[in-house]
Amino acid sequence: TMWNVAVERQIQVKGPDAEKFVDYVITRDATKISPMRARYVILCNAYGGVLNDPILLRISKDEFWFSLSDSDIGMYLQGVNADGKFNCTIEEIDACPVQIQGPKSKALMKDLCGDQVDFDNMPFYGLAEVKIAGRSCVISQSGFSGEAGYEIYLRNATLYAEDMWNAVLEAGKKHKLMVIAPAHHRRIQAGILSWGQDMDMQHNPYQCNLGYQVSLSGKGEWNKKADYVGKAALE
């Protein structure tokens, strides 16, 4: 299935202090996220309330995208850096995604992208830069279904959305691709939360099964020593 999730907004954080800034606003350790990898993250307010739970894409050493469908996180992030303490830009960019989900998603993506990406060895939450119908896209192995799947983020989406859309439809013909709206019953079955429906800023991570996102005494990305918004309330 192809899901039209163009409602998801991409907030770009870019510049020399991008990593430092992102690490300050999320609960897990951003310094341990490699370029061309993504992660599911949460942002909390000073009281520990969950402000949003976006997918964070690390496009390069100094560039991150917060991919979110609800709330005004873009304005929040700009407010956090209103004093210019962090040397980075924060803006919503013209990049919109569609999701290819289901057991045939890998086969479809191979037909769509050819040898641009080694899909057999692409890790979960791995990213890749590709051209689709000659247009620049970022692909992530992720989705909202709990099944195998991918997200295609089209750059300059207001100009080239139709080109990418038609290319996916053409590649999907032999796979019997169906275009649907986001299937919430699938994400509910998979235990995937939706901010604004399952939790909001009135809930802390421990109240909605997201306590693992808080760095306490864990390892790796959970062994975070740096300060972050909400740390005093959560730890």
Cite the ranges covered by each PLM segment.
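Acidic, proline/glycine-enriched N-terminal capping motif
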Residues: T1-L43, G49
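Short beta-strand and beta-hairpin "edge-sheet" elements
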Residues: L51-P54
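Detector for glycine-centered tight turns/loop "hinges" at secondary-structure junctions
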Residues: Y47-G48, G134
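Conserved, structured C-terminal
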Residues: L57-E235
